[in-house]
Amino acid sequence: MKLAILSCSPRCYSTRRLVEAAEQRGIKAKVLNTLKFAIDLAEGEPDLYYRSKQLSDYDGVLPRIGASITYFGTAVVRQFEQMDVFCANSSAGISNSRDKLRSLQILSRHQIGIPKTTFVRDRKDILPAIERVGGSPVIIKLLEGTQGVGVILAENVKVAEAIIETLQSTKQNVLVQQFVAESRGKDIRAFVIGDRVVAAMRRVAVGNEFRSNVHRGGQTEAVVLDETYAETAVRAAQIMGLRVAGVDMLEGTNGPQVMEVNSSPGLEGIESATKLDIAGAIIDYMSAQVDFPEVDVRQRLTVSRGYGVTELHVRDGSDYVGKTIDESGLPELDINVLTLYRGTTVIPNPRLKRTLEPHDRLLCFGKLEAMRGMVPEKVRKQRRPKIKRLPDSAATIHAESSRDD
């Protein structure tokens, strides 16, 4: 396997360890500076140039994209995806993980435990927002920030209001988030590779610091996660579209509360705390998965006229409740169930004899017209109205205004 590691920091611990682990396994790994790429596009010929030379073929790509170059970095990863090269983390997953609001929206939609969070712009909404997340003390976060930068603890409402107003006056977007008191100054970092947690550590802040990030002097200790925490970490990473991720969780009274899913987790802290070869585990995973590059299903299916992918909900009282997928008539309608979601359980490629239950969600591929007819009329989205022609008088006004310009 020929591996490319995308990184602007070839001498940092994580990059050096990945190269070392690859070489120990007889794998040729090269560190490529993400900012030295040029993306070329032509009909049917997506291509990449590196330092002004056409890039040679690589079997796999391990992105280590810094937050400051997210846009360009994800564009490079996306180009590798278009060229059918396996990428450890998808471009979409990296982009989603960098946007704190977007990532929490995705996790919330999939019933992952998160601290109560609100996002406001109007000054009049600030106080009600603080109350909705549980009142003071409250956490205030900038939408973009890493290693604890841009995270503020406001001990009372007046201080919180002043901080939010000040940040908004400088055109900053901020999140207002519940302060999980029982987890003050500590959190858990679970390192996910593929479909399992390979290592986990607890990070504890020093002194009066409430942020437990290692870069802020936080101390670490290895921990063994119970099934609930491990399952939450894996689901969070997979939902975000990340095969290699650091999932940060608070230890709440109601179970794990996911704060963030990191697409470029550092290796030094987790390897030092656990004494495990995490870099080697990443390389081993890539070796096993390199023949299965990311496929943009929706993009591929746009050429299938009249067909598409959608999610069907089995509602209370539906005729499908109690029937198997086979008995539901979906196969006869040329509708294939790709995945069944039941609560927090994901059932890929479910058997036709699987019985449907209320609140099941079915990810289906088939004829759009047939699937549209299965959505109850009261929840069905209205079709887009036809665009009407402007009256002649309006067209005349437009022509005159154009001449004035």
UniProtKB/Swiss-Prot annotation:
Mn(2+) 2 binds at E260, N262. Binds 2 magnesium or manganese ions per subunit. InterPro entries: ATP-grasp, ATP-grasp_RimK-type, ATP_grasp_subdomain_1, RCK_C, RCK_C_sf, Rimk_N, Rp_bS6_RimK/Lys_biosynth_LsyX. Residues 380-405 are annotated as: Disordered. The gene is rimK. Residues 104-287 form the ATP-grasp domain. It is an enzyme of class 6 (ligase). ATP binds at residues 131-187, 211-213. PROSITE patterns: ATP_GRASP, RCK_C. This is Probable alpha-L-glutamate ligase. It comes from Rhodopirellula baltica (strain DSM 10527 / NCIMB 13988 / SH1). Its cofactor is Mg(2+); Mn(2+). GO terms for biological process: potassium ion transport; protein modification process; SOS response; translation.
